[in-house]
Amino acid sequence: MAPNNQLGKRVKLTQVRRPFIVGTTAVPFSETNPRPVGAPDNHTHSWSVFVKGLEDTDITYWLRRVQFKLHESIPNHVRMIEGEAGKPFMVTETGWGEFDITVKLYYVNESGEKPQTLYHYLRLHPFGRTEEEKQAMITKNGEVRAWSYEEQLFNEPYEAFFNILTSGQGKKSTDAAAPARRQ
């Protein structure tokens, strides 16, 4: 006989997808993006790495924390970011080089799921096969974006987590008064 589980039974033959974006943005230091006080002289860019919902929807109802493991040369290179409703999970730094960032996703306790690990490459400079592809990565303010669409697939979630996933949560973070959107 299976042990008693506080999360309920698994919802058989069910898959629930939750889309999100993992990405980096980088901006070279300039008059419009000045070097922060205390940043080393050899640093050339400010950059951010983040995990957020599509169209800035809130994902904290299913994702409770994200761990970003940065390059070992960065002080406090393992950063644990707790979820705040309506805000992306984000780390902002300065630097001069590109590197792989390990991104570990921790789900809400009701999920009963183990953490998931992803990898994302910090891009400070545009890349592509053609000049058009490179220019497509740069915004008007000179920001280089390297964003990836991801989907988290929950196979046969526990009943408690299934109810959370299908409750219609996921409001846009820019409009807290808007009605909840079904995901």
Pin down the residues of each PLM region:
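Long, charged low-complexity regulatory segments
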Residues: 2-15, 21, 108-183
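Compact, well-ordered interaction domains used in eukaryotic information-processing assemblies
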Residues: 29-142, 146
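A structural supersecondary motif
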Residues: 7-39
